[in-house]
């Protein structure tokens, strides 16, 4: 880089301009070298010479809104005010012998369009600035320009707006045809000064004519040969001068008019409209980029106070900051609910996304920030009732309808003061909001699939099985400790076999009736053999004073059922003798009944009474065990495995009972031997008893 710069400095230019350029380059290189001793890239050196030309207005957010016109979307693309179009029009007029009025101002405007851009800074040729629209709405402005339908409107304040077209040709036509040049004293002065120029020019012509005459006279004196020719030439010159003097005032008039109008257009002066609107004086001019809405214009708008603010549901009057803030929070909450409850078709991609529809047809531009509408609050926050006192309501129905325009700009002005122009759109807007915020519940039921239904059924079955398997021992047994071993065994069989139901059997009678009918034989399974003490206690039963009797569910009912089914008259059945001894034991009761009265008259002896007292608790225990044993046999049918386990215990009890019976028989025989009258009968009884014992 240093070598290149040195080469640039050493180049010698021939012209002075080249020298100045080389000197400027060498000076800039020297400054760069002095400031930066190290090598510097070209881009960094050029940054120092870049000027920053940005205003603060450009940094502010664009708060302009567009209110579109449906009728302004068509463009012909033909410039009617162009020079070619005007010449074609004149040719047609001559062909049909029609004298067209030439409008030089249109030609001047068309030809001077580039000059307008140079003379007017930041001009927008496609837009016109319209002032004096104090009581006009958006539709009124569109109706005023119905011959030249605009594309959209940009409201600036209550009294002015920008009317925008899609091309600059239509805007210039509207400006020239709908407005006229402003009345000024300069126009009259120019008109009065131009006739005074005419006699001056005629005098000059006459003077020249007189001088010519003098010269001709001198020439005639010298030679009088060409008198006629000279006279003809003089006449022709005079005629030419007169014709020129007659044409000059017309040209000056035309140029003066065009020049005045040209000056007014170049100065961008407001031009009054040809026809007023409802008595309002309207003015038109070209719009510029500086014609923008100021911040806080909505808060200062008197139109909103008079006709209602569409940004806040069409409320009239002065709206407090707290009321505006609450309105914004409600609107935000409503939008959040709307996004949380989308339609089912939106998630599936069947329906297009929802767009706001209203008569103003706003373009989706960034909204004006809420901070512009709010000022610093005073101490404390006002109540809603206090804020409502300040607000003047149009009517109660408009309050319930909700906001007319959610994305409204400074003002939508839909139809002006007449509220009937946008009622249909507002009703459609509210209905669409309700449809979005509250989706139908019937559609949500259709989203369930067959796999979900199968899964729910499987879960219900699994839960029922878990409840059955997690049941306690009492639910499987079906009775308490005093309910008997038969109820316990049956309860286990039922709990292990039945899987379809989870009902708990609490009554032994139901089990016994099922066993009678034989319904449980198919579902029953062999009982599981348990260890020692628990099996003996379950089969032999518990004492009546056992503390576990309280826990039993229906012990009394089971005893009553056993007593009803089988009378407890037989002692041997209560003692629980083995089955092969039952026949011999049951065959003796009728003979015992015959001698029952004799034994009651004689009374027991001391030994017999002592043995009887000792046998009472054992007989009670054996009787209770016999009762439970009978229940076990009636309820469970055949239990071969249980009898094999208890055969040793039964043999021991049987041996003890036989010894006691033999002792009692011996005592009876010794007592009966002392009675001679009854010796034969006693001997028979004794023989029978010995045979039975053997």
Curated annotation (Swiss-Prot):
Associates with NCBP1/CBP80 to form an alternative cap-binding complex (CBC) which plays a key role in mRNA export. NCBP3 serves as adapter protein linking the capped RNAs (m7GpppG-capped RNA) to NCBP1/CBP80. Unlike the conventional CBC with NCBP2 which binds both small nuclear RNA (snRNA) and messenger (mRNA) and is involved in their export from the nucleus, the alternative CBC with NCBP3 does not bind snRNA and associates only with mRNA thereby playing a role in only mRNA export. Coiled coil: none annotated. This is Nuclear cap-binding protein subunit 3. One of its GO terms (cellular component) is cytoplasm. Residues 126-187 are annotated as: RNA recognition motif (RRM) domain. Component of an alternative cap-binding complex (CBC) composed of NCBP1/CBP80 and NCBP3. Belongs to the NCBP3 family. Residues 15-36, 236-264, 387-404, 501-517, 563-595, 605-618 have a biased composition (Basic and acidic residues). The lineage of its organism: Eukaryota, Metazoa, Chordata, Craniata, Vertebrata. Residues 685-694 have a biased composition (Low complexity). GO terms for molecular function: mRNA binding; RNA 7-methylguanosine cap binding; RNA cap binding.
């Amino acid at each position: 880089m240093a070598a290149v710069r040195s080469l640039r400095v050493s180049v010698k230019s021939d012209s002075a301009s080249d020298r100045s350029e080389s000197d400027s380059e060498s000076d800039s290189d020297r400054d760069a070298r002095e400031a930066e001793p190290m090598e510097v890239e070209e881009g960094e050196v050029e940054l120092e010479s870049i000027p920053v030309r940005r205003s603060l207005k450009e940094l502010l957010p664009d708060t302009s809104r567009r209110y579109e016109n449906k009728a302004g979307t068509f463009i012909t693309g033909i410039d009617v005010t162009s020079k070619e179009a005007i010449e074609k029009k004149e040719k047609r007029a001559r062909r049909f012998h029609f004298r067209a009025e030439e409008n030089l101002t249109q030609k001047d405007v068309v030809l001077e369009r580039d000059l307008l851009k140079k003379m007017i800074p930041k001009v927008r040729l496609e837009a016109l600035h319209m002032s004096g629209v104090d009581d006009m709405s958006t539709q009124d402005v569109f109706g005023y320009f119905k011959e030249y339908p605009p594309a959209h409107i940009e409201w600036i304040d209550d009294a002015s707006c920008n009317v925008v077209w899609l091309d600059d040709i239509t805007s210039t036509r509207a400006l020239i045809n709908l407005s006229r040049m402003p009345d000024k004293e300069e126009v009259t002065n120019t008109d009065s000064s131009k006739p005074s120029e005419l006699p001056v020019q005629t005098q000059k012509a006459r003077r020249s004519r007189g001088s010519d005459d003098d010269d001709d006279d001198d020439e005639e004196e010298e030679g009088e040969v060409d008198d006629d020719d000279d006279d003809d030439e003089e006449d022709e010159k005079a005629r030419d001068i007169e014709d020129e003097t007659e044409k000059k005032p017309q040209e000056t008039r035309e140029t003066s008019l065009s020049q005045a109008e040209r000056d007014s257009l170049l100065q961008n002066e407001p031009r009054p409209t040809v026809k007023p609107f409802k008595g309002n004086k309207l003015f038109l001019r070209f719009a510029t980029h500086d014609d923008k809405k100021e911040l806080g214009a909505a808060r200062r708008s008197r139109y909103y106070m008079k006709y209602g603010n569409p940004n806040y549901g069409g409320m009239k009057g002065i709206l407090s900051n707290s009321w505006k803030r609450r309105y914004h929070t409600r609107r935000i909450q409503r939008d959040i609910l709307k996004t949380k409850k989308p339609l089912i078709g939106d998630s599936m991609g069947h329906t297009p996304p929802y767009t706001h529809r209203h008569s103003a047809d706003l373009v989706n531009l960034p909204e004006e920030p809420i901070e512009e509408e709010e000022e610093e609050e005073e101490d404390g926050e006002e109540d809603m009732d206090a804020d409502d006192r300040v607000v003047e309501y149009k009517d109660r129905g408009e309050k319930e309808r909700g906001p007319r325009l959610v994305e409204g700009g400074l003002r939508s002005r839909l139809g002006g003061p007449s509220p009937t122009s946008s009622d249909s759109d507002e009703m459609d807007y509210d209905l669409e909001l309700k449809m979005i915020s509250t989706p139908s519940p019937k559609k949500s039921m259709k989203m369930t699939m067959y796999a979900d239904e199968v899964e729910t059924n499987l879960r219900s079955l699994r839960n029922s099985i878990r409840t059955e398997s997690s049941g306690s021992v009492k639910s499987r047994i079906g009775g308490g400790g005093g309910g008997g071993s038969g109820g316990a065994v049956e309860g286990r069989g039922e709990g292990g076999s039945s899987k379809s139901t989870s009902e708990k059997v609490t009554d032994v009678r139901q089990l016994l009736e099922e066993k009678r009918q034989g319904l449980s034989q198919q579902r029953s399974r062999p009982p599981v053999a348990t260890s020692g003490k628990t099996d003996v206690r379950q089969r032999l039963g518990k004492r009546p004073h056992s503390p576990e009797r309280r826990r039993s569910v229906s012990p009394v009912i089971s005893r009553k059922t056993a007593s009803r089914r089988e009378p407890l008259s037989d002692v041997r059945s209560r003692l629980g003798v083995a089955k092969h001894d039952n026949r011999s034991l049951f065959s003796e009761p009728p003979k015992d009944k015959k001698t029952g009265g004799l034994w009651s008259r004689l009374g027991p002896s001391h030994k017999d009474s002592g043995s009887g007292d000792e046998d009472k608790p054992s007989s009670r225990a054996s009787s209770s065990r016999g009762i439970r044993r009978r229940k076990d046999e009636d309820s469970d049918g055949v239990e071969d495995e249980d009898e094999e386990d208890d055969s040793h215990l039964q043999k021991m009890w049987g041996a003890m009972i036989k010894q006691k019976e033999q002792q009692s028989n011996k005592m009876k025989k010794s007592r009966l031997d002392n009675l001679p009258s009854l010796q034969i009968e006693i001997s028979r009884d004794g023989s029978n008893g010995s045979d039975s014992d053997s």
